[in-house]
Amino acid sequence: MAGRVKWVTDIEKSVLINNFEKRGWVQVTENEDWNFYWMSVQTIRNVFSVETGYRLSDDQIVNHFPNHYELTRKDLMVKNIKRYRKELEKEGSPLAEKDENGKYLYLDFVPVTYMLPADYNLFVEEFRKSPSSTWIMKPCGKAQGKGIFLINKLSQIKKWSRDSKTSSFVSQSTKEAYVISLYINNPLLIGGRKFDLRLYVLVSTYRPLRCYMYKLGFCRFCTVKYTPSTSELDNMFVHLTNVAIQKHGEDYNHIHGGKWTVNNLRLYLESTRGREVTSKLFDEIHWIIVQSLKAVAPVMNNDKHCFECYGYDIIIDDKLKPWLIEVNASPSLTSSTANDRILKYNLINDTLNIAVPNGEIPDCKWNKSPPKEVLGNYEILYDEELAQGDGAERELRSRPGQPVGPRTGRSRDSGRNVLTTWK
């Protein structure tokens, strides 16, 4: 068995196990010597905890960064993006330019968001500026649409506060932290239904930042036609695209799973909105993903034993502006349809080809820069070393004349060096 990768996983999914077995890798237990561990976020917390005192050797790699939650917890993601904006502002970067109303021209890509209970007073102040607005509340550490609800009255928050057995939002209680975000109430609709994008982004290293976009993302549609009517605020089949919720709807389609490929979306938008604005939209999606990664890179523990495949959730509004909603550390590997199973099998296959070159025993000291021919359906989204090597002022894109962000960017390598674009 010498020379064969020994693998462990605590996530029993066929798309994972079939990929390991296809490579002739050998399954072992976590108590034996292993080279590759595809683990849950709970396990990664234990592996890297001070109490455990576990040290990974050079021939071991895992699929999460130790403090991935700086990006994948809703509250910390927003906190880091806000800090990133302030730092760019302090530097005088053109990226931090604002309009006459004080809104960021280029960095306004997450909905207005507050942390509860900490930011309750700030939220109330903002709410009173637009009392007819709708807000969406989400628990910071949950996924699959659990614990989410919409509100359009302060009294609803106060009632929730009482129901949560907390005496006051102003006091720091031990209750579960929530974020409350301005709800995008003008989403782009197709067939009258709301949808979002699930995009896969692989990060092999944060310093230098090197990330890849998977070309086979998809759209997730709601089963019930969208209405901003306040009478439907409680109907999650109208508002939340999560498959975990939509699959319980009467109109859920088990054949296509309420999903479209990103390529189908692109074709639809090119035919209804035009090729130029569609290209601009996808450039902007690239832009906000790179900026979100740049925002967390300084605080991320760039452990050489780690890589991570994130699930990015993006909503497009009716003006074709993309919004970053959240980033998932463990995007679902459950297959809801036959096409879903093929997509996720190929996603894992391509991820492993990049993370474990040639399927050989890992060496965490390698430069994490695989040859282009092994990328499969991934394409380089951003490579900090290449960007710096070519000069921070140069825009590396295959479609000239379509800048994203300020044209005069000179500070802090703006992150506009998108190496490839959606095909």
Curated annotation (Swiss-Prot):
PROSITE patterns: TTL. It holds the Pfam family TTL. The record marks 144 as: Essential for specifying alpha-elongation versus initiation step of the polyglutamylase activity. GO terms for cellular component: ciliary basal body; cytoplasm; extracellular region; microtubule; motile cilium. Residues 1-367 form the TTL domain. SUPFAM superfamilies: Glutathione synthetase ATP-binding domain-like. It catalyses: (L-glutamyl)(n)-gamma-L-glutamyl-L-glutamyl-[protein] + L-glutamate + ATP = (L-glutamyl)(n+1)-gamma-L-glutamyl-L-glutamyl-[protein] + ADP + phosphate + H(+). Mg(2+) 2 binds at residues 326, 328. GO terms for molecular function: ATP binding; metal ion binding; protein-glutamic acid ligase activity, elongating; tubulin binding; tubulin-glutamic acid ligase activity. InterPro entries: TTL/TTLL_fam. Residues 390-423 are annotated as: Disordered. Mg(2+) 1 binds at residues 313, 326. GO terms for biological process: axoneme assembly; cerebellar Purkinje cell differentiation; epithelial cilium movement involved in extracellular fluid movement; flagellated sperm motility; immune response in nasopharyngeal-associated lymphoid tissue; microtubule cytoskeleton organization; mucociliary clearance; protein modification process. It is found in: Cytoplasm, Cytoskeleton; Cytoplasm, Cytoskeleton, Cilium basal body; Cytoplasm, Cytoskeleton, Cilium axoneme; Cell projection, Cilium, Flagellum. It comes from the Eukaryota. ATP binds at residues 138, 144-145, 181-184, 194-196, 241-242. Transmembrane segments: none annotated. Keywords: ATP-binding, Cell projection, Cilium, Cytoplasm, Cytoskeleton, Flagellum, Ligase, Magnesium, Metal-binding, Microtubule, Nucleotide-binding. Its cofactor is Mg(2+). Part of the neuronal tubulin polyglutamylase complex which contains TPGS1, TPGS2, TTLL1, LRRC49 and NICN1. Interacts with PCM1, CSTPP1 and LRRC49. Catalytic subunit of a polyglutamylase complex which modifies tubulin, generating side chains of glutamate on the gamma-carboxyl group of specific glutamate residues within the C-terminal tail of tubulin. Probably involved in the side-chain elongation step of the polyglutamylation reaction rather than the initiation step. Modifies both alpha- and beta-tubulins with a preference for the alpha-tail. Belongs to the tubulin polyglutamylase family. PANTHER family: POLYGLUTAMYLASE COMPLEX SUBUNIT TTLL1, TUBULIN POLYGLUTAMYLASE. This is Polyglutamylase complex subunit TTLL1. It comes from Rattus norvegicus.
